[in-house]
């Protein structure tokens, strides 16, 4: 269910939504065994834990203050409810099989936001900035901290628009790090971090043979 309106240079849209997932997969940490000193050996993997109900509100704003500057943003607030149990087994130091079950019934609220800016600089250089933030969220095993990230991109058409030179900087301040606090009574109490990829800077050159950038693909 959504609503769209335009006020001068501003375009606003709002919507509410509901999603139901019968087989919901989540990242789960569990004890796979014990080392000779009795310290738990933990494993992280995606597991089908049961069902998920998600409801939320989304707000989108597009704004062009000038011909050379375009802004678009998105804000999403949601509430998620999970239901299910996770069964697993491991051997203790005496080689006894230990059966465990963890309940994943949980309700949490969170949000995420995105802002994208596109500026046309002199000499027909395009400058794009993308900023995202995923808010913190609790789960049945602990919580995930908020994640902030920013990307930059500069591009220019050359050779009579037959080619494009682009400079991209992904994760400018090296902040796209997933921080987890995990607590399972009697088994796990830990803080961990996971970074998919550190800051990257790439320079690319794309040439379009027998085709201008403004040409349309043949139907």
Language model region names:
Residues 1-5, 57-63, 115-119, 152-156, ...:
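Residues on the lipid-exposed face of transmembrane beta-strands in outer-membrane beta-barrel proteins
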Residues 3, 14-20, 73-79, 129-133, ...:
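Transmembrane beta-barrel strands of outer-membrane/channel proteins
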Residues 6-8, 51-55, 103-111, 146-150, ...:
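Residues that define the transmembrane beta-barrel architecture of outer-membrane proteins
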Residues 7, 11-70, 74, 100-103, ...:
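Outer membrane beta-barrel strand-and-loop segments of large Gram-negative receptors
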Residues 9-12, 67-71, 123-128, 160-165, ...:
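Repeated loop/turn-to-beta-strand initiation elements of outer-membrane beta-barrel proteins
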Residues 16, 24-33, 38-40, 83-92, ...:
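Outer-membrane beta-barrel translocator domains and adjoining extracellular loop/strand segments
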Residues 107-158, 173, 181-182:
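C-terminal beta-barrel architecture of Gram-negative outer-membrane proteins
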Residues 156-219:
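C-terminal beta-signal and adjacent terminal beta-strands/loops
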């Amino acid at each position: 269910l959504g609503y769209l309106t335009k006020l001068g240079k501003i375009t606003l849209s709002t919507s509410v939504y509901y999603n139901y997932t019968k087989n919901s997969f989540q990242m789960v940490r569990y004890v796979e065994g014990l080392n000779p000193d009795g310290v738990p050996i933990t494993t992280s993997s995606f597991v089908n834990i049961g069902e998920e109900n998600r409801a939320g509100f989304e707000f989108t704003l597009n704004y062009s203050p000038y011909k050379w500057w375009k802004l678009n943003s998105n804000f999403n607030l949601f509430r998620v409810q999970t239901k299910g149990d996770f069964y697993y087994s491991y051997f203790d130091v005496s080689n006894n099989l230990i059966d465990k079950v963890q309940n994943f019934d949980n309700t949490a609220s969170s949000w995420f936001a995105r802002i994208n800016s596109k500026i046309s600089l002199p000499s027909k250089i395009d400058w794009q900035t993308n900023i995202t933030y995923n808010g913190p969220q609790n789960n049945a095993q602990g919580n995930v901290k908020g994640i902030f990230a920013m990307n930059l991109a500069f591009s220019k058409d050359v050779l009579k628009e037959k080619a494009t030179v682009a400079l991209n900087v992904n994760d400018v301040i090296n902040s796209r790090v997933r921080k987890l606090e995990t607590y399972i009574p009697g088994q796990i109490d830990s803080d961990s971090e996971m970074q998919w990829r550190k800051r990257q800077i790439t320079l690319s050159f794309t040439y379009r043979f027998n085709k201008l950038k403004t040409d349309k693909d043949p139907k």
